[in-house]
Amino acid sequence: MTQTLQVKSRINDYPIIFTDDIFQPLNQFLAEKGDVKLLFITDQTVFDLYQPLFRRFQQDYDSYLHIAAPGGQSKSLEEVSRIYDRLIRANFSKKDVIVTVGGGVIGDLGGFVAATFYRGISYVQIPTTLLSQVDSSIGGKVGVHFKGLTNMIGSIYPPNQIIVSAKFLDTLSEREFACGISEMIKIGFIHDRKLFQQLLAFPKDRNQEQLRQMIFQAICHKKRVVEKDEFEGNLRMSLNFGHTLGHAIEALCHHELYRHGEAIAIGMVFEAKLAVQQQLLSQQDLEALQAAFEAYQLPTTLEAKSMTAEALMTVLKTDKKNSGQHIVLILPTTKGYVSFPIAKHDSRLLDWLRSLLDIA
């Protein structure tokens, strides 16, 4: 059964297509494009898992393949340069198409290449992780890391279509699955407490139909937010809950020790503790949030003792979400969220990092 959500965008509208047959919507899109070349971008892990799929891609289409190393280190200008070289050697034109097949790193990387090659060519996202299906593939954010700083270079460039197949989730490790759940917990805690409660109960039964429904709900919430605030003026900032500190943690561990979903889980608990301190959130809500992460074996405290509050502060001061001389945190409230700017020179933040993260 195929189901389609249409996302409205000020750049170009695009569909999110839920299907077990990824070829049908891809073929339909390519038929409208005419005679085109395709570059499939993936990573070694996904390629090894789905070699028959990539063989069929090569059989069915005039296509080329770029395989990146797995992990956040591939989200770099060096990898972008390698892909540019491949496109130029293959004589790609502005009418040709990039197709990303992978998780958030591959989607962001391929989307950034599509946004910048010939000042923009078409691209399709086929997200293969839970995190990329419910979050990173939707909304048009593309980009790469730069000199250890997370997502420092990027753009808003929506895909021409997103093809979501739950079949890809069958090969996810428990750790990768939990990272996707982390983003769903974020959406539920801020925007839909009923979804949050379902996620809290889900580990006990693992009903696959319920999982599909929760994925659909999470995607609907992300769609609603990015349609109302595509360029992150206000409402979309809510989706940065946990990400200010989370991105700093990722940067300091070079995108290796903690995966994205794990780093933002720590960030969300930190911001929730701060919200309790500011009397914006109840202790009961904080404990429920911690329980949700613990149910999926997600970290809620910083275990990398080598990270100091001073080192985190240094990275936080470079965060792209900052406003002037203020670091912007997103604090959850009983009924939603608030943007919480704090001056970069304010010593309270250093104290909060030390006390709430229990680090030096």
From Swiss-Prot:
Transmembrane segments: none annotated. Its cofactor is Co(2+); Zn(2+); NAD(+). Keywords: Amino-acid biosynthesis, Aromatic amino acid biosynthesis, Cobalt, Cytoplasm, Lyase, Metal-binding, NAD, Nucleotide-binding, Zinc. Zn(2+) binds at residues 183, 243, 260. GO terms for biological process: amino acid biosynthetic process; aromatic amino acid family biosynthetic process; chorismate biosynthetic process. It is an enzyme of class 4 (lyase). NAD(+) binds at residues 104-108, 128-129, 141, 168-171. It catalyses: 7-phospho-2-dehydro-3-deoxy-D-arabino-heptonate = 3-dehydroquinate + phosphate. Its main location: cytoplasm. GO terms for molecular function: 3-dehydroquinate synthase activity; metal ion binding; nucleotide binding. It is found in: Cytoplasm. Binds 1 divalent metal cation per subunit. Can use either Co(2+) or Zn(2+). SUPFAM superfamilies: Dehydroquinate synthase-like. Its EC number is 4.2.3.4. One of its GO terms (cellular component) is cytoplasm. Pathway: Metabolic intermediate biosynthesis; chorismate biosynthesis; chorismate from D-erythrose 4-phosphate and phosphoenolpyruvate: step 2/7. Catalyzes the conversion of 3-deoxy-D-arabino-heptulosonate 7-phosphate (DAHP) to dehydroquinate (DHQ). Belongs to the sugar phosphate cyclases superfamily. Dehydroquinate synthase family. HAMAP family: DHQ_synthase. This is 3-dehydroquinate synthase. The lineage of its organism: Bacteria, Bacillati, Bacillota, Bacilli, Lactobacillales.
